[in-house]
A protein has these predicted regions:
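Catalytic alpha/beta core domains of metabolic enzymes, predominantly
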Residues: 127, 141-247
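Active-site beta->alpha loop and helix N-cap motifs at the rims of alpha/beta catalytic domains
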Residues: 2-11, 15-143
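A general structural signal for well-ordered alpha-helical segments in protein cores
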Residues: 6, 27, 59, 63, ...
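Glycine-rich phosphate-binding "P-loop"
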Residues: 137, 159-160, 270-271
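Helix N-cap/beta->alpha junction signal
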Residues: 84, 190-191, 277
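Alpha-helical structural signal in soluble globular domains
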Residues: 61, 65-70, 94, 98, ...
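Catalytic cores of TIM-barrel enzymes
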Residues: 2-5, 37, 175-178, 184, ...
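C-terminal alpha-helical cap/extension of soluble enzyme domains
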Residues: 5-15, 33, 37-38, 199-202, ...
């Protein structure tokens, strides 16, 4: 039986910048805030962390820093994926040596690999790093959609451990849960899908919103895991406005603005991302005010 890397909420950490350099002071404060608020795991170098604009050296430094800062208090999952199989495998190997508890590997994008090619891509990564591998399906970004049939094949590979599902397709979640039951752990990749996915067996979420509200997202997942659907739904409805506005522009633009408004970092992004519009800022401000965050 597959044992989950974590149960509950994992935050897909933002990467704070100051004058185009990684702001480790702010990152350290964000990590401590997350831990104090009861988050269950942390993901570094993911989409929310602007991984595509980080250099290889920056990615390695971020992984090392986060592992060291957490010091075993929660699992650290390192985003190591890419569309170059060898490079993704090497970064995954590095993450393991740095002390990461698992890796998050996005489906290989742009290349349009065959189903067999995608399976082989993940096989090589898993064999290289010998860490729990979380497969990340986000077709809106990658142009590739992993199917329940692909998951079934992946679940037979040692170290292919879990799925972060962000395809928005509830029918496919059911088939994935059926085909991979006991062999791969399912996690939601969208805050707004979390409770629905947990109702069919997902063990939690990799969350964007938990950058801002880690305790609420963690409490929501905990309530659902304990069978308190009423309590979980109450938290979900309270947070629904924020879940929505954090995706009114491309992630992580809104969440970085929100974190800046709360005083955690500068509102600084790397191109080609740019700051959100004044209209979006007002919408985010309203959501933060309604939750008593500013």
């Amino acid at each position: 039986m597959n044992q989950p890397l974590y149960t509950g909420a994992a935050t897909a950490l933002i990467t704070p910048f100051c004058n185009n350099r990684i702001d480790y002071k702010s990152l350290g404060e964000i990590i401590e805030f997350q831990l104090a608020e009861g988050i269950n795991a942390l993901v570094v170098c993911g989409t929310t962390g602007e991984v595509s604009t980080l250099t290889v050296e920056e990615r390695k430094n971020l992984i090392e820093y986060t592992v060291e800062k957490c010091a075993g208090r929660v699992p650290v999952i390192a985003g190591t994926g890419g569309n170059n199989t060898e490079s993704a495998a090497e970064m995954s190997l590095f993450a393991g040596k740095a002390g990461a508890d698992g890796i998050l590997s996005v489906a290989p994008y742009y290349n349009k690999g065959t189903k067999s090619g995608i399976v082989e891509h993940y096989r090589i990564i898993a064999e290289k790093c010998c860490l729990p591998v979380m497969v990340y399906n986000v077709p809106s970004r990658t142009g590739v959609s992993l199917t329940p049939e692909i998951y079934a094949r992946l679940s037979e590979i040692p170290y292919i451990h879990s799925v972060k599902e962000a395809n928005g397709n509830a029918a496919s979640w059911l088939m994935t849960a059926k085909k991979c039951a006991g062999r791969m752990t399912l996690y939601s990749g969208n805050d707004s899908d979390t409770l629905q996915m947990m109702s069919i067996g997902a063990k939690g979420v990799i969350s964007v919103a938990s950058n801002v509200i880690p305790k609420r997202v963690s409490d929501m997942c905990r309530a659902e895991l304990l069978g308190d659907r009423h309590g979980a739904l109450g938290i979900c409805l309270e947070c629904a406005e924020l879940f929505d506005v954090l995706f009114c522009e491309v992630n992580p633009v809104p969440v970085k603005y929100a974190m800046a408004r709360m005083g955690f970092c500068r509102n600084e992004l790397r191109l080609p991302l740019t700051m959100c519009t004044p209209e979006t800022e007002k919408t985010i401000d309203t959501a933060l005010e309604n939750l008593g965050l500013i």
